[in-house]
Design a protein with these regions (language model features):
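Conserved catalytic core of the tyrosine transesterase superfamily
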Residues: 1-203
């Protein structure tokens, strides 16, 4: 699944980052401390990225009021299309998010993920955190926010989810974008299915 980053021939399309294996994703999250304020925030932040498929700009644009834990929805004010969207997240993010909210809610309105002073977290801080945790977890590949988005897409496809549904989850403007995004896996799946297909015998 290793992919080299390169210029995409399709203008404006996303370039898939290298996805993590399930073991790597688990190790990355385990590397975040559950005993410190920043560790609890970082673990929740990374878990939501991983289990929602949000872009980093979408995640950091969230306000506390944009989160509905009962419905597991996130109201996005800042999206690539420029239009507000409602997106969801997997129940696997519940525990890490609830632990963070116990610290976050008493601070009042503001960014969902913030500094101790209540200010915004910047993309470069998230990238640095991912690099630090990846090193601590012994992950050799470069771990970036977009890689977590790609990891979710890969896991959904392998779980048998339809590309049209994955496209909606990721907030892609078209299914064609998602198809290019997962092209390496859909090609492999097509070959596997062809080899296993129950076709009429040739006489």
């Amino acid at each position: 699944l290793t992919q080299k980053r390169h210029r995409n021939a399709h203008a404006g399309s996303e370039r898939p980052a290298e996805p993590l294996t399930p073991a790597e994703a688990a190790a990355l999250l385990a590397a975040a401390s559950r005993a410190s304020w920043s560790g609890i925030r970082d673990r929740a932040m990374i878990t939501v990225l991983y289990r929602s498929g949000l872009r980093i700009s979408e995640l950091l644009g969230l306000r506390l009021a944009d989160l509905d834990t009962a419905a597991r929805t996130l109201r996005l004010r800042h999206t690539k299309s420029g239009r507000p969207q409602m997106r969801g997240y997997h129940p696997g993010a519940d525990d890490a998010l609830e632990l963070w909210l116990q610290l976050r809610r008493p601070m009042g309105p503001g960014p969902l993920f913030c500094t101790r002073a209540g200010g915004p977290v910047w993309p470069q801080q998230v990238r640095a955190t991912l690099a630090r945790l990846a090193g601590r977890a012994g992950i050799a590949k470069a771990v970036r926010p977009h890689g977590l988005r790609h990891t979710l897409a890969v896991e959904l496809l392998r779980a048998g989810e339809d590309i049209a549904v994955i496209s909606k989850i990721l907030g892609h403007s078209s299914i064609a974008t998602t198809a290019r995004y997962l092209d390496h896996l859909t090609n492999s799946a097509a070959l596997t299915r062809l080899a296993a297909a129950d076709l009429p015998p040739l006489e």
